[in-house]
Regions:
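Transmembrane helix-boundary elements of multi-pass transport/secretion proteins
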Residues: 3-4, 10, 17-88, 114-116, ...
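Transmembrane helix segments
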Residues: 42-50, 164-210
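Short hydrophobic, aromatic-rich alpha-helical segments embedded in or entering the lipid bilayer
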Residues: 2, 6-14, 191-228, 237
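Residues that define the loop-to-transmembrane-helix transition and helix capping
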Residues: 26-27, 60, 102, 170-171, ...
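Alpha-helical transmembrane segments and their short interhelical loops
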Residues: 101, 106-177, 236-240, 244, ...
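Helix-capping/transition residues at the boundaries of transmembrane alpha-helices
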Residues: 21, 94-96, 164-167
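Helix-loop-helix units of permease transmembrane domains in multi-pass membrane transporters
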Residues: 81-113
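Transmembrane alpha-helix boundary and packing residues in multipass membrane permease domains
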Residues: 41-45, 124, 128, 161, ...
Length: 282
């Protein structure tokens, strides 16, 4: 019990330090701002475009969907961070210290989740003024936003940790981008999913990105907007069920995969990866 509390305190402290560093480093600050600015630009041009005869504007529909997409992208951020720090030896150093691996993973969750929340705030706050038609006045909206976001992070961050243990180099991380972009394209983020073929709708509903987008739309859009969703409903129970299933899967698989990855780490494996990276640069 004492070892666990030490790991939690060390991980929390490590995560806060990493988070503070990410907002004091010019390159990291730019990366935090770049994506929200790009999305706000897209929303600006969509703000007056209507979806069919529904009377709803694409900009209004897209803002909560993009928030859900960004929450799901925490999975990619976690995967990239683990892969990069595995390659540069950070993971090996954590393994060599008492309670190092649990503390390292807790710290990584804190820093990635904290950065994700900051990015969502950077997008949501100005987005409210860019697009109209949002229903954010009541406490119910913010309560739904909170549980969808928290459950979504629990569902996606462990999967990101699993993916980070699979790839052996930062360069190979590029392999994950194409399927993720494909999932975004079919998950109703920038255009309602009901406009897509039925078989694509079924594929999208198997993954967290669609459900995070749906949950965010249910929190921020008026009730009438559910008319353009599948079954003309926000389907809160289904959202909780699918995200919960992904969370259980990730929490069961991630510790096993990460322990196996940590056992394989050694000074020679880190040196070999560095040598391969230098050969690519040369």
């Amino acid at each position: 019990m004492k070892a666990a509390s030490v790991a939690v305190r060390a991980g929390w402290s490590r995560g806060l330090i990493e988070l503070r560093q990410s907002f004091t480093n010019g390159g990291d600050v730019l990366s935090h701002l770049l994506w929200p600015v790009l999305m706000l630009t897209v929303l600006f041009f969509l703000r007056d475009t209507a979806f069919g005869t529904s009377g709803l504007l694409l900009g209004t529909l897209a803002l909560p969907s993009i928030l859900g997409m960004n929450a799901a992208m925490g999975m990619v951020s976690m995967s990239q961070a683990l892969t990069a720090e595995r390659e540069d030896g950070t993971l090996l150093r954590a393994k060599a210290t008492p309670n190092g691996m649990p503390g390292y993973l807790i710290g990584k969750v804190v820093s990635v989740a904290g950065g994700l929340l900051a990015d969502l705030a950077i997008l949501l706050i100005p987005g409210i003024f860019v697009v109209g038609g949002l229903a954010i006045g009541g406490p119910g909206s913010w309560a739904t936003l909170t549980w969808v976001l928290l459950l979504g992070m629990v569902a996606t961050l462990p999967i990101g940790a699993v993916l980070g243990s699979v790839f052996t180099s930062a360069r190979s991380q590029g392999l994950i981008q194409l399927p993720v972009l494909g999932m975004i394209a079919i998950s109703g983020i920038f255009y309602p999913i009901t406009a897509m073929p039925d078989w694509l709708q079924w594929v999208a509903q198997a993954f967290p990105i669609y459900w995070l987008g749906l949950g965010m739309r249910s929190a921020l859009l008026p009730d009438g907007a559910a008319a353009i969703e599948i079954a003309a409903s926000w389907r809160h129970w289904e959202t909780a069920g699918v995200l919960g299933a992904w969370a259980v899967l990730g929490l069961l698989v991630a510790p096993v995969v990460l322990r196996r990855m940590a056992r394989r780490e050694s000074g020679s494996s880190v040196a070999a990866r560095r040598e391969r990276a230098l050969r690519r640069v040369g």
